[in-house]
């Protein structure tokens, strides 16, 4: 994080940029994380209003899921004290809310996988091949059984993370496990549903193709699956691991 907040009177001057602001072309107010100083303790956040001096947004760029994002640019943009959301050291408090966001991410990914499953199930019950419906073929029956197990197991992990909240926030460990499994299951089930339906599932006339694209995005958004694995490993070994390269020794 390189966007800086430099003191200027009662407020701050913001310089830097922020990428991947989803639907930012429609927003009037933006939340941006900034660096007041070094390290995690130096991170906070401010509110920036569209149209103010020193602030602009880039042209929209489309994600594979169909959503669009813009980049934010700060060139000595002034933020008054009333627009400082979190001062220096505040990021440690706000980061607890990420687990809540990840629960929502997880639920949406799972819902898309289940929706794709239901579309493919109904298709297999009515589509005929070689004189009988697709669900009469044992190979496809096994596919649906495996998809059902993945969805139900993912749902239980999601409920565990949501219900076992401590002080209003899900635990980082259970949230990471749920996100890792549900994101993976949601995509795999949607992808398998498309395979079962063949060309019909690959068509934009069928919502399964959207489910595949969107569930793939959830495997990145809100913390990549690799980040979730890192967090789970820390719980396994009951210690923190730094993924950063060692700093060179100073003389």
Model-found features: residue ranges?
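Short polar/acidic secondary-structure junctions
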Residues: 6, 36-39, 62-64
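Alpha-helical interface subdomain recognition
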Residues: 7-12, 73, 96-251
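Internal mixed beta-strand/loop scaffold within catalytic domains of large alpha/beta enzymes
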Residues: 3-17, 21
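Conserved hydrophobic/aromatic beta-strand scaffold that supports enzyme active sites
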Residues: 2-4, 11, 29-33, 45-47, ...
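A short, charged helix-loop
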Residues: 70-96
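Flexible, small-/acidic-enriched active-site or ligand-binding loops
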Residues: 51-78
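A short core secondary-structure module
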Residues: 15-56
């Amino acid at each position: 994080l390189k966007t800086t907040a430099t003191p200027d009177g009662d407020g701050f001057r913001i310089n830097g940029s922020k990428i991947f602001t989803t639907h930012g072309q429609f927003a009037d107010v933006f939340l941006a994380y900034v660096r007041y100083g070094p390290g995690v303790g130096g991170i906070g956040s401010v509110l920036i209003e569209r149209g103010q001096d020193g602030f602009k947004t880039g042209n929209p760029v489309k994600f594979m899921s169909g959503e669009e994002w813009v980049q934010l640019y700060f060139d000595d943009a002034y933020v008054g004290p009333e627009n400082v959301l979190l001062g220096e050291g505040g990021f440690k408090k706000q980061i607890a809310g990420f687990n809540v966001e990840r629960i929502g991410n997880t639920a949406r990914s799972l819902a898309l996988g289940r929706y794709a499953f239901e579309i493919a199930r109904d298709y297999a019950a009515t589509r005929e091949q070689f004189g009988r419906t697709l669900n009469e073929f044992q190979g496809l029956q096994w596919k649906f059984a495996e998809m059902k197990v993945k969805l139900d197991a993912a749902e239980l992990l999601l409920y565990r993370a949501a219900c076992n909240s401590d002080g209003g926030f899900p635990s980082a460990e259970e949230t990471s496990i749920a996100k890792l499994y549900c994101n993976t299951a949601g995509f795999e089930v949607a992808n398998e549903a498309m395979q079962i339906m063949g060309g019909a599932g690959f068509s934009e006339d069928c919502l399964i193709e959207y489910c595949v694209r969107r569930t793939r995005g959830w495997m990145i958004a809100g913390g990549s699956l690799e980040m979730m694995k890192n967090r789970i490993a820390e719980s396994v070994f009951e210690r923190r691991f730094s993924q950063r390269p060692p700093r060179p020794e100073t003389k």
